């Protein structure tokens, strides 16, 4: 991608030929990309480019493909292995035929999935997994209720499925359109409430009168009053957005915990 202008300008998104990545060293593997996925992070990275300077960047942080070369320290994969991964923000992305990626943030592609299906999973699934099990510390014996806002989205859909498959926590999902409501119910949501309803808090509390134990939210802006109302004392919230001006003081009276989930923190900071 090249920064600058609206998408109707021909050179904003460029089909370009660039030098092939260098031979992999260390823990890097070189992957022939067979399929990729598009995510909000692509838009965010592109928006941060130097528009005036015409900065260029290979986007893409979800891929599936085949290993064609490995570094001297690799132990997990060898040429010919099919893999899938999200990659790291600091490196060129998957919108190319070849990509270098650290094997330690790569997984074997499930044999039951084709490349396109596998490429749709890493970023959303890892985000949902870390939100539930690293941030909220849910486990097999966990109970209570989680409110999943934006439940029909990519991450929300995975949050529902992982919660129902791996815990005893009940799921209240928000959705608006009939298709979205049917979708989240098909994934296992125990109850569905109207995402845009003015009485959303009342709908949630009608299902969980004492408040929900946990909340997953993909968007924080304007949500703190709702969350203050529907989360029980000592409850927990995990958010995945980039809201910079967020006043959380209203949560203090109930000692509600707020967690940030950022999937790229692990490859960036170890």
How would you name each of these model-derived features?
Residues 19-37, 47-90:
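Glycine-rich beta-strand-centered segment in the early N-terminal region that forms part
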Residues 24, 78, 139-141, 232:
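Residue-level recognition of short, solvent-exposed, well-ordered loop/turn junctions
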Residues 94-95, 175-183, 245-248:
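Short, glycine/polar-rich helix-capping loops at beta-to-alpha or helix-loop-helix junctions
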């Amino acid at each position: 991608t090249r920064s600058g202008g609206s998408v109707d300008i021909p050179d904003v998104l460029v089909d370009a030929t660039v030098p092939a990545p260098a031979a992999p060293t260390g823990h890097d593997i070189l992957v022939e990309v067979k399929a990729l996925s598009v995510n909000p992070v692509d838009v965010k990275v592109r928006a941060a480019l130097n528009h005036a300077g015409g900065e260029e960047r290979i986007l893409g942080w979800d891929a599936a493909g085949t290993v064609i070369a490995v570094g001297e320290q690799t132990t997990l994969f060898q040429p010919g292995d099919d893999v899938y991964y999200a990659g790291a923000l600091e490196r060129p992305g998957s919108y190319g035929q070849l990509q270098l990626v650290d094997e330690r943030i790569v997984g074997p592609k499930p044999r039951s999935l084709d490349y396109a299906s596998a490429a749709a999973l890493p970023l959303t699934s890892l985000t949902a997994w870390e939100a539930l099990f690293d941030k909220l510390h849910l486990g097999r014996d966990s109970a209570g209720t989680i409110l999943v806002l934006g439940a029909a989205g990519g991450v929300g859909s995975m949050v529902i499925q992982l919660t129902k498959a791996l815990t005893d926590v009940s799921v209240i999902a928000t959705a608006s359109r009939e298709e979205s409501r049917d979708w989240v119910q098909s994934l296992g949501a125990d109850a569905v409430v109207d995402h845009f309803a003015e009485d959303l808090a009342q709908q949630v509390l009608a299902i969980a009168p004492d408040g929900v134990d946990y909340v997953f939210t993909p968007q924080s802006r304007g949500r703190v009053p709702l969350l203050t109302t529907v989360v029980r004392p000592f409850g927990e919230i995990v958010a995945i957005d980039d809201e910079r001006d967020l006043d959380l003081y209203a949560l203090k009276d109930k000692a509600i915990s707020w967690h940030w989930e950022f999937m790229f923190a692990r490859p960036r900071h170890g």
